[in-house]
From Swiss-Prot:
It holds the Pfam family Hormone_2. It is found in: Secreted. Residues 25-59 are annotated as: Disordered. Belongs to the glucagon family. The lineage of its organism: Eukaryota, Metazoa, Chordata, Craniata, Vertebrata. This is Pro-glucagon. Residues 1-20 form the signal peptide. One of its GO terms (cellular component) is extracellular space. Residues 84-89, 131-145 form a propeptide. The gene is GCG. Proglucagon is post-translationally processed in a tissue-specific manner in pancreatic A cells and intestinal L cells. In pancreatic A cells, the major bioactive hormone is glucagon cleaved by PCSK2/PC2. In the intestinal L cells PCSK1/PC1 liberates GLP-1, GLP-2, glicentin and oxyntomodulin. GLP-1 is further N-terminally truncated by post-translational processing in the intestinal L cells resulting in GLP-1(7-37) GLP-1-(7-36)amide. The C-terminal amidation is neither important for the metabolism of GLP-1 nor for its effects on the endocrine pancreas. The modification Arginine amide is found at residue 127. Its main location: secreted.
């Protein structure tokens, strides 16, 4: 896109220069006063000075155009930088997240290794097999529950007895 603007600006400047040059030629031809013989219009030095002047004007205009383009590009860069909130900080955040993820991954690997060691120790200890030497152990193993907030076996027994008593009272009070 920048090259398109550059080419368009160059064409505009060339067209403007040729338009100004043609106007100057028209004005010189239409002058009502003939040039005296001592006037150096036909002199090659005068032609080269005019040529250098027009080249200098073109170069000056072109330099001004390039300066304005650089200024526009710089402003655009500043706006993009502000929108992106400084790319260096973004890279730093990504690096920190990567480091934190690596740390988390290392901790997870360590904990998995520890869990595997504990499981192997549990299997070696004999907890993996169910040896029921006494019936007390069977009842105790079957009644054991998670610590997830569920009622214990005793609480269920109490609730069952309360429900049974309420049901019997209801039967006695209702006439069938």
């Amino acid at each position: 896109m920048k090259s398109l603007y550059f080419v368009a600006g160059l064409l505009v400047m060339l067209a403007q220069g040729s338009w100004q040059h043609s106007l100057q030629n028209t004005e010189e031809k239409s002058s009502s006063f003939p040039a005296p013989q001592t006037d150096p219009l036909g002199d090659p030095d005068q032609i080269s000075e005019d040529k250098r002047h027009s080249q200098g004007t073109f170069t000056s205009d072109y330099s001004k155009y390039l300066d304005s383009r650089r200024a526009q590009d710089f402003v655009q860069w500043l706006m993009n930088t502000k929108r992106n909130k400084n790319n260096i900080a973004k890279r730093h955040d990504e690096f920190e997240r990567h480091a934190e993820g690596t740390f988390t991954s290392d901790v997870s690997s360590y904990l998995e290794g520890q869990a595997a060691k504990e499981f192997i120790a549990w299997l070696v200890k004999g907890r993996g097999r169910r040896d029921f030497p006494e019936e007390v152990n069977i009842v105790e193993e079957l009644r054991r529950r998670h610590a997830d907030g569920s009622f214990s076996d005793e609480m269920n027994t109490v609730l069952d007895s309360l429900a049974t008593r309420d049901f019997i009272n209801w039967l006695l009070q209702t006439k069938i």
